[in-house]
């Protein structure tokens, strides 16, 4: 209930307005993509617990429950204001479910249990583990990037400089 209450407070709209917390998708095609994936999940038995509406490129924050591992909303990177919530008997089972993906950008773990924090860090197949914050959290000096099909390399000032330059070597033998 607390998560749902927080999601309900998100103001959607013009990103230039101070009260806006959720701006538009990058383009119409991206908004249509997430809309179709959510609709497909619901048609396959998922429960739309909140959201799911779209006005142009604005897509409501969306919570899906009772999804299956095979649904597109679980097998693809959403890059949208949508989340699937699953119940698991153990923390380890939840980590296995997360790893059962071709992707591994970043993951969030919401816990006060330090054992869970270190277990997640050791076992999650992702480029970064964020504890008690959103998975998109980053600072410019942090390496940001994924593993598996989420890409290679890292972003961040240092990493961007290395990626955007081409080293060149000169060996001069004057003998």
Predicted regions and their residues:
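ALDH superfamily catalytic-core signature
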Residues: 1-69, 131
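Conserved C-terminal structural/oligomerization subdomain of aldehyde/semialdehyde dehydrogenase
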Residues: 8-12, 55-175
């Amino acid at each position: 209930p607390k998560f749902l209450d927080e999601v309900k407070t998100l103001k959607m709209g013009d990103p230039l307005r101070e009260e806006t917390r959720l701006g538009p998708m990058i383009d119409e095609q991206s908004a249509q993509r997430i809309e179709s994936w959510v609709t497909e999940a619901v048609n396959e038995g998922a429960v739309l617990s909140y959201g799911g509406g779209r006005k142009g490129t604005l897509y409501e924050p969306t919570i899906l429950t009772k999804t299956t591992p095979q649904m597109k909303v679980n097998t693809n990177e959403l890059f949208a204001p949508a989340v699937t919530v699953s119940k698991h008997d153990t923390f380890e089972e939840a980590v296995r479910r997360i790893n059962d993906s071709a992707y591994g950008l970043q993951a969030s773990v919401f816990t006060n249990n330090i054992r869970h924090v270190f277990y997640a860090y050791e076992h999650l197949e992702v480029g970064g583990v964020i504890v008690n914050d959103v998975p998109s959290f980053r600072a410019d000096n942090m390496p940001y990037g994924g593993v598996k099909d989420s890409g290679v390399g890292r972003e961040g000032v240092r990493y961007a400089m290395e990626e955007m330059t081409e080293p060149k070597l000169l060996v001069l033998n004057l003998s």
